[in-house]
Amino acid sequence: MEFLDEFPTMGRSDLRDLKKSIDGGFREFSRTYGEGLENFFDPLLHFLVWFERLLVNTPWPIVLGAIAALVWFGARSVTMVIATIVCFMVIGYLDMWEDTMATLAIVSVATIICIAIGLPVGILMARSNKFQAAITPVLDVMQTIPSFVYLIPVVMLLGIGKVPGLIAVCIYALPPMARLTNLGIRLVDKEVLEAATAFGADYKQKLFGVQIPLALPTIFAGVNQTIMMALSMVVIASLIGVAGLGVPVLRAVSNQYLALGLMNGLAIVALAIIFDRVSQRFGRRMQSHREEGAGH
């Protein structure tokens, strides 16, 4: 009955040897290719540092004006612009301006990278069922594995710093972009595609002239999810040297500072709401513009 009482497990020595072999193999890989990977990501590091310094060192009225202009361009809403200005004024007044600019820099760069990778991956998934079947398990792993787990190999390869944190954010935030791009393209009405084919459109013309424009609401939902997940990683990424609003939150947790944690947490929420509302309205506006153009 011992077999039923205790689940059969690998011997401790065998399990220890297995773990040692995995750790040893990855350390050897890190020693061999770590420097090359660091050199590969150097341009990304320089760009991120430059963008962060640009936001931090530029006079705040100019930064606030630029943010308000971007919000107006995306949302075309005076209310949204005023709400954004008020949020950033409160954030600055509570001495969180520099941390907010650092967070804004890493989230913006991570979102751009996720869109640049996720959009083509989603298009390929929509084009090929085999590619979708192959890449879906990878996206599942990226989305479900605890974020602390993939911090380990990233830190072992690249050490502590901005780039490892950025890579961790991108790994976590990329899957929604690819999934929803694939979904949006696949949901385009087949009759519309047949009509485009009847008018002599080739694959590229159908993709960029029909499928992607009609899939924009779903694609922008993917952008929204990517931004939200990138912001949710800010606190975790601060564990490996990423500056921003996550650092005070960690300090507040360690020292039980309720006010500090609450203020910085609400600043992250404010950024999330602004990004979300602006991207949603921009997506709807582009879709309505396409529909009006098609009507004429």
Residue ranges of predicted features:
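Alpha-helical membrane-interface segments at transmembrane helix boundaries
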Residues: 45-56, 97-105, 109, 132-135, ...
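Transmembrane-helix boundary motif in ABC transporter permease subunits
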Residues: 69-73, 91-98, 110-139
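Membrane-spanning helices that line or support transport/gating and their immediate boundary helices
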Residues: 99-103, 123, 133, 137, ...
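Generic hydrophobic transmembrane alpha-helix motif, especially the helices
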Residues: 106-109, 114-117, 123-126, 139-173
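Glycine-rich helix-loop "coupling/hinge" segments at transmembrane-helix boundaries
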Residues: 156, 185, 230-271, 283-296
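Short cytoplasmic-facing helical segments at TM-TM junctions of multi-pass membrane proteins
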Residues: 177-225, 249
